[in-house]
Structures are given as C-alpha cells and as structure tokens.
Amino acid sequence: MLRLPVSQSNTPTTPIIVKCPTCKKEVEWGEQSPYRPFCTKRCQLIDLGEWAEEEKSIPGAPDLSDSDGWSDDMGY
C-alpha cells in the first residue's frame, strides 16, 4: 500500500502529479488546477471534441438490435 506523508490537516505534503491526457504536460492534482486532469481549458475542450467526434470510445459489445426502427426493410 502506498502511503504519502500527511500533515496535521490530513492532506498529502507532497503534491500528486498527473499527466494531462491531451498534451502529456505534468499537472499538479489540487484546487490550484481547476481543469484537472487537464492542464488547461483548451486541452479539456480538445478531449471533449474527440469524444464528440467518436475518435475516442469505451469498448463494448455492439448493439445489433433492430428495436430502433431504422431497419432496411420498412415493410412497404
């Protein structure tokens, strides 16, 4: 188990550093980094755009059901 040094206020005394998912710049995880885990609002919006354009996705089984009403055979 990882133990970090703790101050009297029960918060880690050494900052936790993570890499921005977009540009890989190091970001300190804390209140001073409002866009964490991103380094800036720009990197946050780039990531959002990648999800919106379906450049990123969470793997899963495809939905092959015809219950959406968009099948090729419309019945007429």
From Swiss-Prot:
Biological process per Gene Ontology, one example term: regulation of DNA-templated transcription
Organism name: Photobacterium profundum (strain SS9)
Entry function: Inhibits all the catalytic activities of DNA gyrase by preventing its interaction with DNA. Acts by binding directly to the C-terminal domain of GyrB, which probably disrupts DNA binding by the gyrase.
One Pfam family matching this protein: YacG
Residues annotated to bind Zn(2+): 20, 23, 39, 43
Acidic residues compositional bias, start-end: 65-76
Name this polypeptide is given: DNA gyrase inhibitor YacG
Keyword vocabulary terms for this entry: Metal-binding, Zinc
Region (Disordered): 54-76
Cofactor(s) recorded in Swiss-Prot or TrEMBL: Zn(2+)
GO-annotated molecular function: DNA topoisomerase type II (double strand cut, ATP-hydrolyzing) inhibitor activity; zinc ion binding
Cofactor note: Binds 1 zinc ion.
Matching SUPFAM superfamilies: Glucocorticoid receptor-like (DNA-binding domain) (SSF57716)
Gene this chain is encoded by: yacG
Family: Belongs to the DNA gyrase inhibitor YacG family.
Tagged with keyword Mitochondrion: no
